[in-house]
């Protein structure tokens, strides 16, 4: 639960700080951010979804710690999060 709460807090903070305005952009950014957080590296976060933003050292440190928490999840839990993400992405493509 701690990791989930931290993930939600960081993701919502990033959406607010980045100042994304359109709903489609919000969804696309959020889904790419989650996907990279689940299966990518911190560097891929900075080059991908956060690439156009100036991520300060404290935020990078927080993201590395969050990524570490996600990477330490039991494999079955991480697998279920990835499956959930795939469901959401598939549902978005259908609309």
UniProtKB/Swiss-Prot annotation:
Q: Which organism is it from?
A: Mus musculus
Q: What is the lineage of its organism?
A: Eukaryota, Metazoa, Chordata, Craniata, Vertebrata
Alphabetized PROSITE patterns for the sequence: SCGB
**SUPFAM superfamilies tied to this protein:** Uteroglobin-like (SSF48201)
Q: Which UniProt keywords apply?
A: Secreted, Signal
Where is this chain's protein located in or outside the cell? Secreted
Pfam annotation, one family: Uteroglobin
- Please report which protein family the annotation says this sequence is part of: Belongs to the secretoglobin family.
- Report if keyword Signal is assigned: yes
Name of this chain's protein: Secretoglobin family 1C member 1
């Amino acid at each position: 639960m701690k990791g989930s709460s931290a993930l939600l807090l960081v993701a919502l903070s990033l959406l607010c700080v980045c100042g994304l305005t359109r709903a489609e952009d919000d969804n696309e950014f959020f889904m790419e951010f989650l996907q990279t957080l689940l299966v990518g590296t911190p560097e891929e976060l900075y080059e991908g979804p956060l690439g156009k933003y100036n991520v300060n050292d404290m935020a990078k440190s927080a993201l590395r710690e969050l990524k570490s928490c996600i990477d330490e999840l039991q494999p079955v839990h991480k697998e279920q999060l990835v499956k959930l993400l795939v469901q959401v992405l598939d549902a978005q493509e259908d609309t």
